[in-house]
């Protein structure tokens, strides 16, 4: 059984017949994300619901997206316990002021862990005066990308319960895919993978999310 999934007996009703069959379900478990500066104690940022797996990427991507982590200041990312439900991100310098988040952030939406919408808006950067023109992608190729993403979703194929975020190059080639119950978590994993690889910025790339 793959990480983030669990086998379970379920009742299936087909063609007027009710029967018990074995199925594979997507599961969520809490992950406590902590951050520690060069000379300080570890501080809890959030407790994030997620399917176990790719936790290093999730924590790194979330902190980067929150503006709490600059890639060149990342020192180490690792689990703090054998159970794998707490992860610590260590920085080379001091931790910036932490956002006021609720204790638990579910997979429902990326804003749910924030204390207020005003806090979200205050953290947004000022819009650029000139919007940089991105890559040009043929419409025919662009319309093919959802099917490419869907065919690569092994977790969804097994459970029917996982979303995905995919990173494509300007030619429409799938470079990276991550799955999660929440699409924002899946995107944080993609971003986190690129941060850990030192592969930022992501200019001339396409991000694609699965739909309902």
Regions found by a protein language model. Give the residues of each.
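Glycine- and Gly-Pro-enriched alpha-helical subdomains that act as flexible
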Residues: 155-211
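Intrinsically disordered, low-complexity regions enriched in acidic/Ser/Thr/Pro/Gln residues
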Residues: 1-177
């Amino acid at each position: 059984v793959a990480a983030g999934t669990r086998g379970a007996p379920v009742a299936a009703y087909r063609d007027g017949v009710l029967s018990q069959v074995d199925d594979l379900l997507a599961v969520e478990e809490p992950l406590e994300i902590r951050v520690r500066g060069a000379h300080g104690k570890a501080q809890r940022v959030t407790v994030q619901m997620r399917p176990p797996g790719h936790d290093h990427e999730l924590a790194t991507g979330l902190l980067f997206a929150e503006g709490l982590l600059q890639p060149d200041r990342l020192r180490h990312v690792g689990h703090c316990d054998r159970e794998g439900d707490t992860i610590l991100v260590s920085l080379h310098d001091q931790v910036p002021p932490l956002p006021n988040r609720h204790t638990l952030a579910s997979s429902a939406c990326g804003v749910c862990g924030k204390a207020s919408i005003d806090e979200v808006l205050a953290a947004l950067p000022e819009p650029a005066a000139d919007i940089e023109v991105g890559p040009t992608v043929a419409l025919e190729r662009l319309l093919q990308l959802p099917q490419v993403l869907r065919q690569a979703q092994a977790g969804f194929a097994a459970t029917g319960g996982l979303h995905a975020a995919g990173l494509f190059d300007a030619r429409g080639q799938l470079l990276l895919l991550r799955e999660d119950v929440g699409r924002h978590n899946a995107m944080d994993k993609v971003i986190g993978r690129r941060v850990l690889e030192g592969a930022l910025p992501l200019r001339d790339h396409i991000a694609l999310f699965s739909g309902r």
